[in-house]
Amino acid sequence: MKKQVLIAGGGIAGMAAALGASHAGWDARLFERATVFSEVGAGVQLGPNVVRRLQAWGLQKSLQQVAAVPQQLVARSALSGQVLASAPLGQSMVERYGAAYVTIHRADLHTVLHSAAQERADIYINPGQEVAELLGTERVTTIRTAANKVVEGDALMLADGVWSKLRPVVLGDHSRPRVSGHLAYRALLPMADIPVGWRSNEVTVWLGPHMHAVHYPVRRGEMMNIVVIIEGPA
């Protein structure tokens, strides 16, 4: 009889966990509080190790349809604009690590994973069903949903976000979120609206006192993702 993992949360981590379990020969039963799956946020960078795993799951074509492949990483001074360091990406990553270094919008990555999970017969997706309580972990792992449904499995994966109700139950109060002392401001701009001189197919990092900023293309170069991180209270 196949083992079954119970997954709390249907975001990027939850969908990836379900696919990983499925490809490892497990059944995966995923529970998501929202009735409609969606992913908010902006861009994310995926190193070659992640891309190799997505390729192993048969997602190379889906990834290519939505991701960008930056050609280099450039670090600049936020004060002078001077180039401090650079490193090749693009084909250099493929030759060295066997896969590209890509940048992608989080919503696009979630769509790729969700679509792949829906095609797997051993992944059971349950929207509108929040995992509310962990009942036991002795003989089997037992959970109760917010609708008072009791479900048993062989393992539990918590992927229900930074405000998880179950993580403190499993790991204790020290696992609760803490203020980092940094604030992140994010934006997405159509590449066509950016002055030509600022458009690039690069990951650019601007380094300055008590701050740094990063921008890179997403959505096959049609959008630029920007994040500025500064020190400050929450």
Regions found by a protein language model. Name each.
Residues 2, 25, 41, 70, ...:
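Short coil/loop residues immediately preceding or within conserved phosphate-binding loops
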Residues 13, 36, 163:
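Conserved Rossmann-like nucleotide-cofactor binding loop
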Residues 200-234:
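Active-site substrate-recognition segment that forms the wall
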Residues 2-5, 22, 49-170, 175-190, ...:
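Conserved N-terminal helical subregion
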Residues 167-170, 197, 227:
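A short secondary-structure junction signal
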Residues 35-55:
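Conserved N-terminal glycine-rich FAD pyrophosphate-binding loop of Rossmann-like flavoproteins
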Residues 3-30:
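N-terminal Rossmann-like FAD-binding beta1-loop-alpha1 element of flavoenzymes
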Residues 6, 29, 124, 214, ...:
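A structural signal for isolated positions on well-ordered beta-strands in alpha/beta enzyme cores
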